[in-house]
Design a protein with these regions (language model features):
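Selective transmembrane helix interface/packing segments
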Residues: 1-358
Length: 358
């Protein structure tokens, strides 16, 4: 499988031959940052279009069809329209926190997005405590949401923000336990190493029952973490209008909207990385010809295919199940998912100690 570190090393050598090393490193950081933001924007556009089409399919509709072939240009038109909208600042609001909140949410999303290993040698932030960094970066978004609700001077926004904060903080525990289950299996917290350990089989299939249970818990908790249906109580239209979004307009609302969709992709990308092998191709023992053919498919194609499969799965869940009440959401987490996650972690420890995994 192709290693993108060959390209990055060549670019680094080329830049250092033309300029001082410090300036070359600075230029590399700028290039990587621009590429990260471009990929972030492209993923957001693809996710929004996919959401509208999947929603339409489940509701026996066609979705966007007018602008461009099969409605592919509709999202770009919506972005242009949003860019022209006036950003209205609410009277008696805390203007500093009100304007700062969307950018905190975006910052948390971008930092978490940078942790995803897209292909071998194509990781932006890859170090030995990558799991810790991902959990820490993703938790910053809760601060932005609470600030948005508090600074809007609106009781519905505040209630929506408090619901969202309680929900996100609670379900981070189950996400952490699910990821920790795989960390115990691999003995590493570096995402690239977790992927490399799956060269002979994805953990969803070779980690036995604890890995499967962790995957199911992760999908449920991840859906709740990004406030997607049936866990989208912070935006319950019949109760709170738009929740903490209520008083936001223009690009401020757009930043919240984009962050929600990219966070969904991040949850799916992490699931693809730790459970489905990341950039590793599908290999079947004994099928040498098939395995060789699969190796020719680039790693980033495998990663995005797996990630978007999980995205589709989560969208299917959203448009299938009815919205839960806040007490049902917290009961599901504290009475069921957390205890099951703890017992499952203990089972994985037993599996690893007695070498019961493949």
């Amino acid at each position: 499988m192709f290693d993108f570190s060959i390209i990055t090393s060549w670019v680094h050598g080329l830049l250092t031959s033309w300029m001082p090393e410090g300036l070359a490193i600075f230029l590399e950081c700028v290039i990587v940052g621009v590429c990260l933001l471009l990929m972030y924007a492209v993923i957001a556009i693809v996710m929004i279009f996919m959401e509208r089409k999947v929603c339409a399919a489940f509701q026996c509709r066609l979705g966007p069809m007018r602008v461009g072939p099969w409605g592919t240009v509709q999202v770009f038109c919506d972005v242009l329209k949003m860019l022209t909208k006036e950003i209205i600042t609410i009277r008696h609001s805390d203007r500093l926190l009100y304007n700062l909140a969307p950018y905190i949410v975006i910052l948390a999303s971008v930092l978490a997005f940078a942790c995803l290993p897209v292909a071998r040698g194509l990781e932006i932030l890859d170090f030995n405590v990558g799991v810790f960094f991902l959990m820490a970066a993703s938790s910053i978004g809760v601060v932005g949401i609470l600030l948005a609700g508090w600074s809007s001077n609106n009781k519905y926004s505040l209630i929506g923000a408090m619901r969202s904060g309680a929900q996100m903080i609670s379900y981070e525990l189950s996400i952490g336990l699910s990821i920790l289950t795989i960390v115990v299996l691999t003995d590493t917290m570096q995402f690239s190493e977790i992927v490399e350990r799956q060269a002979d089989g994805w953990f969803l299939f070779k980690g036995h029952i604890p890995a499967l249970i962790a995957f199911v818990i992760y999908l449920i908790a991840g859906n709740a973490e990004v406030n997607r249906g049936p866990f989208d109580l912070p935006e319950a239209e019949s109760e709170l209008t738009a929740g903490y979004h209520t008083e936001y307009s223009g690009m401020h609302f757009g930043l919240f909207y984009v962050a929600e969709f990219v966070n969904l992709f991040i949850i799916s990308g992490v699931a693809a990385t730790i459970f489905l092998g990341g950039w590793m191709p599908l290999h079947i023992p004994g099928w040498e010809g098939f395995n060789t053919a699969m190796d020719y498919i680039p790693g980033f194609v495998w990663f995005f295919a797996k990630a978007f499969f999980v995205v589709w799965l989560l969208m299917w869940i959203k448009w299938t199940f009815p919205r839960l009440r806040i007490d049902q959401i917290l009961t599901l987490e504290w009475k069921y998912l957390v205890p099951i996650g703890l017992v499952n972690l203990l089972l994985m420890v037993i599996v690893v100690v007695f070498k019961l995994h493949f």
